[in-house]
A protein has these predicted regions:
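Surface-exposed patches in mature extracellular/periplasmic domains of secreted proteins
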Residues: 55-64, 114-117, 140-144
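Active-site metal-coordination segments of metallo-dependent hydrolases
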Residues: 38-39, 115-123, 173
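Active-site-adjacent bridging/hinge elements
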Residues: 17-22, 74-75, 100-105, 155-171
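Catalytic Zn2+-binding segment of zinc metalloproteases
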Residues: 102-119, 132
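Hydrophobic helix-coil surface modules that form long, contiguous segments used
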Residues: 1-99, 128
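Sec-exported extracytoplasmic/periplasmic mature domains
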Residues: 50-54, 107-108, 130-138
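Acidic/His/Gly-enriched intrinsically disordered linker/tail segments
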Residues: 123-173
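Flexible glycine/proline-enriched surface loops and loop-helix/loop-strand junctions
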Residues: 29-31, 111-112, 168-173
């Protein structure tokens, strides 16, 4: 992205303390304070998922979060995730999106499906990771509530239809 950004950096230490990496954050200046609140758990998320799925796959590089000009939405890229500026509110409302995009570092970037027909693996594991984070933070009851809430539209379509829309609820859930 090109533009005027504020940047700050934290340091993640691997569980064996043999490696460290920068975790870099880039925001538009007017969203920095909100982003610091909304993204405050990123290091803990990396630690949590490293415990669940194995060490962060790009430990020799970095991880980052960047704000960009979309009205909504988010996208992970290898070693950095981007979020639309309207998802940074300063109240943690969209933490599940931060979790989801981070989980793609393991499921989608370190390991990728051979074709689009298997995109459900990326999205399904990233969505499941949201539930795991909720369980870690809030307990089993909230974990189950979240899974039930996310059950909308499940099994109401094919996982892959080359003629149709492949990013629906069946793929993500």
């Amino acid at each position: 992205a090109i533009g005027k950004y504020d940047k700050w950096t934290e340091t993640y230490y691997s569980s064996d303390s043999l490696n460290k990496m920068p975790v870099e954050y880039y925001t538009y200046p007017e969203y920095t304070e909100n982003a610091k609140i909304d993204w405050k758990n990123t290091l803990r998320m990396i630690e949590f998922f490293s415990g669940k799925f194995g060490e962060y796959p790009f430990i020799k590089e970095k991880y980052g979060m960047a704000l960009f000009g979309w009205v909504g939405g988010a996208m992970e890229h290898q070693t950095i995730s981007s979020m639309g500026y309207t998802l940074v509110k300063g109240n943690g409302k969209y933490e599940n999106i931060v979790v989801h995009e981070l989980a793609h570092q393991w499921f989608g970037d370190a390991v990728s499906p051979e074709s689009w027909k298997d995109i459900w693996l990326n999205e399904g594991f990233a969505s499941y990771s949201e539930a795991l984070w909720i369980e870690n933070e809030k307990g089993k009851e909230d974990y189950i509530k979240y899974l039930k809430k996310e059950d909308y539209g499940f099994f109401q379509g094919t996982v892959y239809d080359p003629e149709g829309f492949i990013f629906g609820p069946t793929v993500y859930n």
